[in-house]
Amino acid sequence: MAPANNPKGLGFQKWSAFWLWAIIGGYFAAFNIWNMRKLDFEGSFQVNSLPGEYAWMKRTAGFVSRASRMRFAWVPVQLLFMISTDFITSACSVIALLQFVPQLRKKYMSIHRMLGEAFFVMMGFGAPSGIMVAVHAFGAAENPSVRLSIMLTGVLTICFLATSFLCITTNGTLSRLRLKLHGASNPDAQDLQKYRAIDIRRHREFILRTLAVMSTGSFSSVYLIIPEVMNWTLGYVAFSCGTLVEDLGLGASYLRSAYPACMVENGGHAGTIVAVKADLSGSEEELTAWGRAGIGMAFWGALVLHMVLAEIYVSALTAVCLLLRYVGLILWLQIRVKSR
């Protein structure tokens, strides 16, 4: 029997993976916890949101407020979806950190599996809720590029996570399906044991891909700083006349001079689309346009960058593990030859 791999191993078998995710996941969790300040809808959310974002939330959710000695406000449904996603992803960050502890997987597999199932269930709720918000938030309803980037992030998260659990599920039907994908014509217990190491490796790879994509939304806010510092020109962004009037509160006289296509006498209506310049130091609608353009660009940049980095890490990890396996096999053969 050939010797096992290097006991210290690489990647998941070392604490380096734990500390790597401690940094990434720590920021990820901190960002989402900090984001929960939005629950103060008439306070923190209104002050820190983009122009028009507060008005959109208030208008689309049927916002109700009562002025009394203690101000009370019903939180919009869309905002609850957003906050629930923040809470779920924060909890998932902590669970993911625990899953990187080698001793937990080796000595307490039942706990590792239980935490993994909790991660799967929570992300099953968190990713769709994020997609639902993305359909409308950040101007996605008027800008397909923004909507596609955020929805693609959610869909990839769900697909990668589902694939990672397919690789290690003990369900009989799914296990037979997995073995058939390996090429086993009549799957049995021996086939299950034969492909076990491959399944575990693939499970780890898809979990890494899941975490890389899952953190896209939080890290896009970091990448958004780049065009701000570099003072990049982000072109023009599509706005509906209804958004300019209802969310940004632009008056008829301003529309007539700046966006004449919105005027009724020119055939304009609430659904008419106009191009608004994205300018960080411009007017209210230009600042909002800059935010929407920047968020769309940051989401695409974060998604592509995280996917590339994840694939590089997975490829390097696989290559080095194979190299160690070959080295171990050669050493074992040398020992066998010398012992004869």
Swiss-Prot record:
GO terms for cellular component: membrane. Disulfide bonds: none annotated. The chain crosses the membrane at residues 15-35, 81-101, 118-138, 148-168, 219-239, 315-335. The keyword Disulfide bond does not apply. Its main location: membrane. The keyword Ribonucleoprotein does not apply. Pathway: Secondary metabolite biosynthesis. Part of the cluster that mediates the biosynthesis of a highly modified cyclo-arginine-tryptophan dipeptide (cRW). The first step of the pathway is perfornmed by the arginine-containing cyclodipeptide synthase (RCPDS) avaA that acts as the scaffold-generating enzyme and is responsible for formation of the cyclo-Arg-Trp (cRW) diketopiperazine. AvaB then acts as a multifunctional flavoenzyme that is responsible for generating the cyclo-Arg-formylkynurenine DKP, which can be deformylated by avaC. AvaB then further catalyzes an additional N-oxidation followed by cyclization and dehydration. This is Ava biosynthesis cluster protein G.
